[in-house]
Amino acid sequence: MARVKTGVVRRRRHKKVLKLARGFFSARHKHFRKAKEQLERSLVYAYRDRRQKKRDFRRLWIVRINAACRLNDLSYSRFMNGLKKANIELDRKILADLAMNDAKAFAALAKQAKDALK
């Protein structure tokens, strides 16, 4: 049987890795070995940060809701408890958007939450 060299397969594999490594710094987008190592790390970072993003946004929404609650003389926890008792089911994303863009509507929600706590 004739010996088969890896020329075509290797070139295809290298091209695939180097294409994915576009935009990396210095040798990490030029040299196959460095690009491959960095690509593995970048995929790990991407996987990790897709999960981290959800936690980060939830924290941001809570900070925004808390700031708006303080303007309405409520703490975040009492506000959320009041909403739950008033059977108002709005998620934190919507509440944070209301807090940022519609202060009157948020104030009305805060008033309902206060009334439910009494």
Swiss-Prot record:
Q: Which GO terms describe its cellular component?
A: ribonucleoprotein complex; ribosome
Q: Please give the SUPFAM superfamilies that the UniProt record associates with this protein.
A: Ribosomal protein L20 (SSF74731)
User: What keywords appear on the UniProt entry?
Assistant: Ribonucleoprotein, Ribosomal protein, RNA-binding, rRNA-binding
Question: Could you tell me which PROSITE patterns the record lists for this protein?
Answer: RIBOSOMAL_L20
What is the annotated role of this protein in its UniProt record? Answer: Binds directly to 23S ribosomal RNA and is necessary for the in vitro assembly process of the 50S ribosomal subunit. It is not involved in the protein synthesizing functions of that subunit.
Q: Which family does it belong to?
A: Belongs to the bacterial ribosomal protein bL20 family.
Under which name does UniProt file this protein? Large ribosomal subunit protein bL20
